[in-house]
Amino acid sequence: MKTLLLTLVVLTIACLDLGYTKTCFNDDLANPKTTELCRHSMYFCFKNSWIAGGVERIERGCSLTCPDIKYNGKYIYCCTRDNCNA
């Protein structure tokens, strides 16, 4: 009986979805290729882009909040789906 109970507990833990983890692009290339698993509290993917020295700069990753500040020509985009910050 103990073996059956232990087996059921192990199967329950193995099959239980302990939480959804978001994935976001995390590189600075125009065509992103790499992703990262966001920490549990990170709900947004973001993409920052701006022009510096005549060259477009891009930053991507996971974020706890979605900043809507656009200043000095900097564009900030946030989204909530997996890999939506291409």
Swiss-Prot record:
UniProt entry keywords in alphabetical sequence: Disulfide bond, Secreted, Signal, Toxin
Chief site of localization: secreted
Cleaved signal peptide residues: 1-21
Tissue: Expressed by the venom gland.
InterPro entries, sorted: Snake_3FTx, Snake_toxin-like_sf, Snake_toxin_con_site, Toxin_cobra-type
Cystine crosslinks: 24-45, 38-62, 66-78, 79-84
GO molecular function annotations of the record: toxin activity
Keyword Nucleus: no
Record bears the keyword Membrane: no
Assigned GO CC terms: extracellular region
Annotated localization: Secreted
Family membership: Belongs to the three-finger toxin family. Short-chain subfamily. Orphan group IX sub-subfamily.
This protein's name: Candiduxin-1
